[in-house]
Regions:
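Rhodanese-like catalytic fold shared by cysteine-dependent sulfurtransferases
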Residues: 1-21, 27-59, 65-100
Length: 100
């Protein structure tokens, strides 16, 4: 499979069309401050067991604070055969989009 980057304004469409599992990969304290409705918190870890927490049968939408860590995670999962979407600008851009 592969990974794709999406704009925050496209999250709802991807969630509806692809029935993705939304995963906030930030630390729990950041997740508690703000998270996308319905997102689960699974903090990113560079070890190989982190990938095993997900099913390859359901697309994933990952986000972190600014988009860089989720991009690394999406690349890693994409190489492992997952269909992954990551949000450009991360949670910061998602919150900004909501304010508009």
């Amino acid at each position: 499979m592969a990974f794709y980057t999406i704009h925050p304004r496209d999250i709802q469409n991807i969630c509806f069309q692809k029935r993705v599992r939304v995963v906030d990969i930030r630390k729990p304290q950041e997740y508690r401050k703000y998270h996308y409705p319905g997102a689960v918190n699974i903090p990113y870890s560079d070890d190989d067991s982190w990938c095993c927490r997900f099913s390859k049968y359901r697309p994933l939408l990952l986000y972190c604070e600014y988009g860089s860590t989720s991009l690394l995670a999406a690349r890693k999962l994409g190489k492992e055969g997952y269909e992954v979407y990551t949000v450009i600008g991360g949670a910061n851009a998602m919150q900004e989009q909501l304010r508009r």
